[in-house]
């Protein structure tokens, strides 16, 4: 029998230690099958190097999205027409290294946000799981996920601020750039030059984005799947799950982008003559609509969806397959 690792969560123990042993029961399997629900509800703990590896791949998407959201700010002429134009312009002006500007901040954000999110989710999930191993209901799991996501977002806000500023630097004239060397240099200088509270600038829209992403993913996937099944063209199989999760990714992207652009603008803003460019997230939304047009709230949609869509697909397909396996193994016959 494998040795017990005290750092493993109960879910990991169920999946690894009990899989081939006498402890493998329907209750434990059901806990695994129902322990995943959306972006911030993923209960299976992954090693930090997995999150870091993913960040390396999505960093260019984050950079392009941030540049698109800042393009045309304050009724200025848009720097980029499309996301592809932004990507090619950055490569041409800043080189291949340019699209990885802010990578150190992205890695720190992933480490702080994901570690906190999964830690909080694990604790709450275990506290609210019944003595017989029955997991919390759907709505309670959704609430746990939103709480964990919002808490993780708060802890990760300083890294978010550094990331936004570092990815935005290349679009500015040399004399206006902040010139942070890395994420730690950014954090130290922000504290020294602007004060500790600036590290949590934009924490409210950052937390709101985490809540919106969770709520939108769960609601849109459930409704999309039901719509596809009711159409008569789909059966409850992996194709249906794939299509429903793709739709969910689109809905989640559309729902969370206005909050995301407010976060980006607030965290990148400067204080001029003691007065910040924006009062709050609502002020950002009002000014974007007034000076740049309503649909400017969705600038950077393509790279944002390219980042969020695949994650949504994998999350729900995994969940569905686990649920099906549970029903097949323990409920059939």
From Swiss-Prot:
Q: Where are the Solcar repeats?
A: 29-127, 136-227, 236-325
Keyword set includes Transmembrane: yes
What the entry lists under Pfam families is as follows: Mito_carr
Q: How does it sit in the membrane?
A: Multi-pass membrane protein
- Tell where it localizes: Membrane
Q: Name one GO cellular component term.
A: membrane
- GO MF entry, a single one: transmembrane transporter activity
TM regions (residue ranges)? 30-61, 102-120, 138-159, 202-221, 241-259, 300-319
Q: Does the keyword Membrane apply?
A: yes
Keywords assigned by UniProt, alphabetized: Antiport, Lipid transport, Membrane, Repeat, Transmembrane, Transmembrane helix, Transport
Superkingdom: Eukaryota
InterPro entries cross-referenced by the UniProt entry:
Mit_carrier, Mito_Metabolite_Transporter, Mitochondrial_sb/sol_carrier, Mt_carrier_dom_sf
Q: How does it assemble?
A: Interacts with SMIM26.
Q: Which family does it belong to?
A: Belongs to the mitochondrial carrier (TC 2.A.29) family.
Function according to Swiss-Prot or TrEMBL: Catalyzes the transport of 2-oxoglutarate (alpha-oxoglutarate) across the inner mitochondrial membrane in an electroneutral exchange for malate. Can also exchange 2-oxoglutarate for other dicarboxylic acids such as malonate, succinate, maleate and oxaloacetate, although with lower affinity. Contributes to several metabolic processes, including the malate-aspartate shuttle, the oxoglutarate/isocitrate shuttle, in gluconeogenesis from lactate, and in nitrogen metabolism. Maintains mitochondrial fusion and fission events, and the organization and morphology of cristae.
Protein name, please? Mitochondrial 2-oxoglutarate/malate carrier protein
User: What is the species of this protein?
Assistant: Sus scrofa
The organism's taxonomic lineage, starting at the top: Eukaryota, Metazoa, Chordata, Craniata, Vertebrata
């Amino acid at each position: 029998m494998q040795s017990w690792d005290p750092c493993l969560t109960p879910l990991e123990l169920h999946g690894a230690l009990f899989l081939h042993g006498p402890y493998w029961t329907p209750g434990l399997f059901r806990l695994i099958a129902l322990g995943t629900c959306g972006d911030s509800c993923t209960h299976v703990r992954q090693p930090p190097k997995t999150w870091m590896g993913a960040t390396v791949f999505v960093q260019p998407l984050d950079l392009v999205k941030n540049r698109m959201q800042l393009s045309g700010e304050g009724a200025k002429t848009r720097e980029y027409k499309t996301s592809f134009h932004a990507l090619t312009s950055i490569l041409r002006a800043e080189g291949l290294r340019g699209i990885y500007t802010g990578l150190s901040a992205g890695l720190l954000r992933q480490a702080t946000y994901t570690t906190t999110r999964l830690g909080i989710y694990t604790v709450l999930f275990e506290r609210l799981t019944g003595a017989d191993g029955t997991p919390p209901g759907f709505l309670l799991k959704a609430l746990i996920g939103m709480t964990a996501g919002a808490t993780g977002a708060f802890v990760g806000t300083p890294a978010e601020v550094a990331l936004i500023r570092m990815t935005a630097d290349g679009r500015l004239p040399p004399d206006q750039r902040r010139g942070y060397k890395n994420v730690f240099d950014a954090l130290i200088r922000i504290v020294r030059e602007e004060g500790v509270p600036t590290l949590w600038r934009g924490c409210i829209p950052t937390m709101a984005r985490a809540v919106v992403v969770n709520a939108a993913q769960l609601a849109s996937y459930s409704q999309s799947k039901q719509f596809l099944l009711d159409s008569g063209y789909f059966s409850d199989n992996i194709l249906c799950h794939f299509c429903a999760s793709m739709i969910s990714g689109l809905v989640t992207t559309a729902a969370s982008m206005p909050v995301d652009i407010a976060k980006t603008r607030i965290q990148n803003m400067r204080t001029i003559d003691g007065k910040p460019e924006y009062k709050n997230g609502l002020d950002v939304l009002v000014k974007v609509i007034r000076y740049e047009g309503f649909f400017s709230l969705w600038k950077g949609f393509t790279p944002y969806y390219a980042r969020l869509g695949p994650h949504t697909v994998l999350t729900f397909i995994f969940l569905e397959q686990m649920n099906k396996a549970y029903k097949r193994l323990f409920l059939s016959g």
